[in-house]
Amino acid sequence: MSKLVKLFITSISAITLALVSFTSSFAKVEGDYIVLGSAISLTGKYSSNGVHTQNGYNLAVERINKMGGVNVGGKSYKFEIIYYDDESNPKRAAQLAERLIKQDGVHYMLGPYSSGLTKAIAPVTEKYKIPMVEANGASRSLFTKGYKYLFAVLSPANQYLEVAIDLAVEKNGGKPVRIAQAFEQDAFSQDVRLGILDAAKRTGSKIIIDDKLPKELNDMAATLA
């Protein structure tokens, strides 16, 4: 099983644990099904990863349902998911989260793809006290706002490459290393960058290149020269 699929199954499993913690009256139930909601990127710039995300959610739900679903309040339920295409647009994602909660009546959400879209939806789920488990939003700022209804199954972006710096220092006999980095200026990429800066300071390593890349980049020759 691929790492990506395992991540999505972990996401659904986290929702399952949350469900077991509540009574069945809290969730939207249609017959023997508990209905989850997800605004996901099926079109637009995130569509490729959005479709992968949807496929992962569907695979996890299929496996859980085949195993008999989950037990809530002494009764077994299976999952189904209502999807809407957020078009890779934060404003649209927030609107669809409102629709899923207010019109479709879902009481549990699965997160979108990307930190930006997760940031757009999180205030909505927080407003309505709807738990959202997400596996694709890693920006550090998501976890510094005191959200009580946002649950992530991955580490924050600032931790992504810290271990790489630690490993490089270890392989260098414990001595500081020279680091070259180049990142786009979006929130996620800059969070990864800040993690490297922290690791460099901690290990006494030196940043020799710290380039900020434009949004549309076709040539990195200047950085690599």
Protein language model regions, located:
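Glycine- and acidic-residue-enriched helix-capping/strand-helix junction motifs
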Residues: 45-55, 187-192
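Beta-alpha junction/loop-to-helix N-cap segments that form part of ligand/metal-binding clefts
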Residues: 28-29, 35, 48-55, 67-144, ...
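Conserved hydrophobic helix-helix packing surfaces used for dimerization/oligomerization
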Residues: 34-36, 179-180
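Extracellular/periplasmic Venus flytrap/periplasmic-binding protein
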Residues: 140-141, 148-225
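Short, low-complexity disordered leader/linker segments with a strong preference
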Residues: 1-35
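Acidic/histidine-rich, surface-exposed loop or edge segments in extracytoplasmic proteins
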Residues: 37-45
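Residue-level signal for short, function-critical loop segments
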Residues: 42, 87, 183-186
